[in-house]
Amino acid sequence: MTKDMTQGSPLKLILAFAVPLMLGSLFQQFYNLADTIIVGRFVGVDALAAVGSVGGLNYLVLGFVNGIACGFSIPISWTFGAKDYREMRRYTANTVWLSLFFAVVLTVVTVALTRAVLVWTNTPDNIIDIADIYIRTIFWGIPFTLLYNVTSALMRALGDRKRPLYFLLVASVLNIGLDLLCILIFRMGAFGAAFATVFSQAVAGIGSLIYIGRHYPELKWSREEGRLSASHCLKLCNMGIPMGLQCSITAIGSVVLQGAVNGLGSSIVAAQTAGSKAAQFLSVPLESIGTAMTTYASQNMGAHDLKRVDRGVNTALGIGCVYSVASFLILRVLDVPLISLFLESSEVEIMANARSFIFWNSVFYIPLAVLIIYRYTIQGLGYSSLAMFAGVAEMVARAMVGFWFVPLWGYFAACIASPVAWFFACFFLIPAYFAVRRRLTKELAAARVED
């Protein structure tokens, strides 16, 4: 089921697209919480700290996977908006070829380097073996993660926001069930949690692929359309790699910061893990508004309607601000119950540190919303490389906090690292959007004169 976003109310279109994604993201965060809760409660604080200690490394790699998948979908969305279905099928076929290549390369490289990176980031000795087993298992599942992300991005590029949600719900329920089975029944520890995640991603990815094959006849390419094309691959890489690097570059700062936090001890790592999981429960769904704006901006760019893009940006900013304020208020009320899911009530100091992390992150959700909306819109307009520099700004900010301020201020510096990074990125992205907007206006005006 496709959806044309070049006609109709931007508010209704963005909400109709974003709300199912938000629900899916909330459910995904719920099963991520469940995953962490089960590990923390039934495996132990060390296992909780181990899973948390590789959070930055996990995002470094899987963020790249998600980024290239989203980037590959942008030319597909352009050609769909322009009603050029022949080119759309060519881009789809070459997306498949590139995905196979990246799946193999990323799996081999990450599995080989995992232990060395854990040592480099000062992972405490009492949790390094658990962390190694957990993240290495996740990396073995990269092909399935990429499959799910590519198929979901492809459906969203054509305006279908419901089907990816359905497959995500299936994966979420399956993941929770397998967590309970692997950890409580089979006593597989952190490896069981990682295995449950990989298996669930595999089911969702394969299911999405089968669904696309059966219900999207417009994507079935001919033999000629399915050939590997250097020009199409180059265009896809120009979109996908910068978006992937944007996530990875951002995560490099997180890895550096995590190394500094790891040096504060496993109790602090456990507090940061619990706090970040609780804070992300409501912050990550903001990405759904950004994802909606990528598709919205891409389709309207294909239709050469930049004024509609502006209306969409203003609408999305309003939605993001309302959501951010509501999320902050909810977390102020529910922070203790959320943290209590991960930790025993006797862990008083860890719980207090986790609450501090939640407060200092949630109070700055509005700049996070602004960052996400402008970043994804710029990507949808075809300037993924420019959006990547916002990731550089975030990386620099987090690395600065890790190198300089964590040694001086301790855990408080870790709590404010992400808000500092969000402000750094906003200072770059807001003027960048208006520069892109002016450039595209001139290009479209020149094209109309030539016609």
For each predicted feature, which ranges?
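Small-residue-rich hydrophobic transmembrane alpha-helices
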Residues: 48-108, 145-164, 258, 271-335, ...
